[in-house]
Design a protein with these regions (language model features):
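Short loop/turn motifs that connect adjacent beta-strands in outer-membrane beta-barrel proteins
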Residues: 20-27, 31-48, 182-203, 250-268
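Outer-envelope beta-barrel architecture signal
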Residues: 45-51, 91, 100-102, 128-132, ...
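Transmembrane beta-barrel strands of outer-membrane/channel proteins
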Residues: 51-59, 97, 106-110, 125, ...
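Outer-membrane beta-barrel translocator/channel fold
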Residues: 56-69, 73-74, 135-173
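Outer-membrane beta-barrel transmembrane domain signature
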Residues: 66, 70-75, 215-322, 331-334
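Extracellular loop and loop/strand-boundary signature of outer-membrane beta-barrel proteins
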Residues: 78-81, 107, 118, 158-166, ...
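Repeated loop/turn-to-beta-strand initiation elements of outer-membrane beta-barrel proteins
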Residues: 101-107, 129-134, 183-187, 252-254, ...
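Outer-membrane beta-barrel "beta-signal"
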Residues: 175-177, 361-375
Length: 375
């Protein structure tokens, strides 16, 4: 009986160990194996681990406009308020660690403190057929608002601009997913990731899905003088779209041995991905004020119209023995627009404003230089 118990215990331990090994083998295969590759077009280096050093210059901005009717003494005056977050660029350096398709990056701000970008975090799972890219950053920058009042189409009879003494904070979370149709001959991440090399020029149609969430927080002082309609702003967008991407191979030389050194590959990528924002949720928060402090808040939740937006990028990748150098520029544009009735009874401006229309956009561009070592 003791021998049987010992045998069963040993069998259970070995089975659990085998299942654990089988799980990690599947994970390793998912991260490192590229299936259905046309080797005349795509080459996969043997090294799976990567260590990279990057430098990024980035600018992110927010611009919006609210149009409304202003009632006074029985007359309705047309009004426009505009809000803008400064676009001073931020420079940062960071590290990227990768294994196969998986890449994790983290960067911190350096240089002049014109734009206080506290952090950048990126998590990527990038394959030739499909991939996911998740990025988050926060940035503080100058915040300004303007107001114009006019009678109909006449020139404004009143205009004022306010520049907040303290910066406003923008937080930005973005998750992109893609699928490449011609993934047998086209390696989409070849110009910004070290795991794939494009041997011959090729391109493909792609589909993409994007989730974006952005928050803009104005300081109380800025809010008090920003004409009251929008002190905090949030937008959540889900977009679907597609486009075309192409890798132009400017130079390629296959490795001929372990000791063979030198330039291996130079590839230029161009990508254009127009998208349609199907879900466009907007939330604005307006505080109530008195002479000494602000208290309470009115929140407006609105679903905006479907809107066309755009994601574009270009990148240059250079393979030099075990080193990979990438220069990439990315630009994306997220537009929002909503017409809704402004409930003046619930606002601190007391029955003087209605028919508020809100529109604007978040825009973000970045230029990234990456040096990677494969091992």
């Amino acid at each position: 009986m003791k021998r049987l118990s010992a045998f069963l215990l040993t069998f259970a331990v070995l089975t659990a160990h085998a299942q654990e090994l089988n799980f990690w083998q599947k994970v390793n295969e998912l991260l490192t194996t590229m299936k259905n590759i046309d080797s005349t077009y795509i080459y996969q280096p043997k090294q799976h681990f990567t260590l990279g050093l990057f430098s990024t210059v980035q600018s992110a901005g927010f611009d919006s406009k609210a149009q409304f009717g202003f009632r006074e003494d029985g007359n309705v005056t047309s009004g426009v308020t505009k809000y803008s977050l400064g676009t001073y660029p931020s420079t940062k350096i960071g590290l990227e660690l990768g294994y196969g398709k998986f890449v994790l990056g983290y960067g911190l701000e350096v240089g002049p403190k014109r734009a206080y970008q506290k952090r950048l975090l990126g998590v990527n799972l990038l394959g030739k057929a499909w991939g996911l890219h998740c990025s988050y950053f926060s940035i503080n920058n100058t915040f300004s608002s303007t107001i114009e009042l006019s009678n109909g189409d006449e020139e404004p009879f009143y205009a004022d601009t306010y520049l907040a003494p303290d910066p406003a904070m923008l937080r930005y979370l973005n998750i992109d997913g893609y699928y490449v149709f011609n993934n047998k001959r086209f390696a989409y991440p070849a110009t910004y990731k070290a795991g794939l090399v494009q041997r011959r020029t090729s391109g493909s149609w792609m589909v993409t899905m994007r989730f974006m969430h952005g928050n803009l927080f104005a300081t109380p002082d800025a809010s008090y003088s920003s004409y009251f309609f929008m002190d905090c702003f949030n937008t959540t967008q889900i977009s679907l779209g597609g486009g075309y991407s192409v890798n132009f191979v400017c130079w390629h030389k296959d490795p001929t041995g372990l000791r063979d050194k030198g330039l291996r590959n130079i590839t230029l990528n161009l990508t254009a991905l127009p998208v349609l924002t199907a879900l466009n949720h907007i939330r604005t928060t307006s505080y109530n004020y008195d002479d000494e402090e602000f208290s309470g808040a009115t929140v407006s939740d609105i679903f905006g119209y479907p809107m066309p937006n755009f994601i574009g990028s270009t990148a240059l990748g250079i393979t030099l023995d075990r080193f990979f150098i990438s220069a990439r520029f990315v630009y994306d544009w997220s537009y929002f627009h909503s017409n809704y009735a402004f409930n003046a009874d619930d606002q601190h401006i007391s029955n003087r404003v209605d028919e508020l229309t809100l529109r604007g956009y978040l825009h973000n561009w970045s230029a990234k230089l990456l040096f990677t070592y494969k091992f």
